């Protein structure tokens, strides 16, 4: 992950965390949307060893999920990272604290789906998360309007950008939020597993 170009001062990097169980075209779709809308230089896919809000039942091994992400990352601007496993961080708030400390010269943006913004108050120390890096929210089918009315969005109303100003987000100091406009992807890891399109081994 720590290639020389990734450490260029001022580089704008989106962080997309997830189980990637498996990685799929939807991940690629939202990544390219965020790259374009936010003017990012890179997006790091942070493959989680174990999402604390998800059961490990039906979860493939970390190495298999990492390999799935590497296979799907068909864009040179995407960097698949195992840094959460190497850091031993369990919660997003700790991962972000470690990354911003290790790479203070990089302008990080946390990328999350509208469905996850709704759940954000259930995340560990979520108010510390929003104070650490700006957050970009990409649309998800059935959740986009609910996300705009969610408690987290309400708490961040005064620091929310218009979608037309989203490219400014990486330049801002947290807290800052932007909802991105764009086509929604209906693909999900759950539906792929339910169709039998993903083996746990």
Swiss-Prot record:
E.C. number: 2.7.7.18
A Pfam family matched in the record: CTP_transf_like
Annotated keywords: ATP-binding, NAD, Nucleotide-binding, Nucleotidyltransferase, Pyridine nucleotide biosynthesis, Transferase
Basic and acidic residues composition bias: residue spans: 192-201
Keyword Phosphoprotein: no
Chain intervals for the UniProt region annotation (Disordered): 182-201
One GO biological process term: NAD biosynthetic process
Pathway named in the protein's UniProt entry: Cofactor biosynthesis; NAD(+) biosynthesis; deamido-NAD(+) from nicotinate D-ribonucleotide: step 1/1
Domain of life per record: Bacteria
Catalyzed reactions: nicotinate beta-D-ribonucleotide + ATP + H(+) = deamido-NAD(+) + diphosphate
Disulfide bonds: none
One GO MF term attached to the UniProt entry: nicotinate-nucleotide adenylyltransferase activity
Entry similarity comment: Belongs to the NadD family.
Function: Catalyzes the reversible adenylation of nicotinate mononucleotide (NaMN) to nicotinic acid adenine dinucleotide (NaAD).
Listed HAMAP family: NaMN_adenylyltr
Protein name listed in UniProt: Probable nicotinate-nucleotide adenylyltransferase
Protein source organism: Parvibaculum lavamentivorans (strain DS-1 / DSM 13023 / NCIMB 13966)
Lineage of source species: Bacteria, Pseudomonadati, Pseudomonadota, Alphaproteobacteria, Hyphomicrobiales
Name of the gene this protein is made from: nadD
């Amino acid at each position: 992950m720590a290639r020389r170009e990734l450490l260029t001062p001022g580089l704008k990097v989106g962080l997309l965390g997830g189980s990637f169980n498996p990685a799929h075209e939807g991940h690629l779709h939202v990544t390219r949307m965020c790259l374009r809308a936010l003017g990012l230089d890179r997006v790091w896919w942070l493959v989680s060893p174990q999402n604390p809000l998800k059961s490990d039942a039906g979860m493939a091994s970390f190495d298999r999920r990492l390999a799935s992400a590497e296979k799907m990352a068909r864009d040179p601007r995407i960097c698949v990272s195992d840094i959460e496993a190497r850091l031993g961080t369990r919660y997003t708030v700790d991962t972000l604290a470690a990354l911003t400390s290790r790479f203070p010269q990089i302008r990080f943006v946390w990328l999350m789906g509208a469905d996850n913004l709704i759940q954000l108050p259930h995340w560990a120390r979520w108010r510390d998360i929003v104070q650490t890096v700006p957050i970009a929210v990409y649309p998800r089918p059935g959740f986009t309007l609910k996300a705009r009315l969610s408690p987290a969005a309400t708490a961040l109303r005064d620091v929310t950008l218009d979608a037309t100003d989203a490219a400014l987000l990486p330049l801002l100091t947290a807290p800052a939020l932007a909802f991105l406009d764009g086509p929604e992807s209906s693909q999900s890891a759950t539906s792929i597993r339910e169709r039998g399109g993903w083996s746990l081994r």
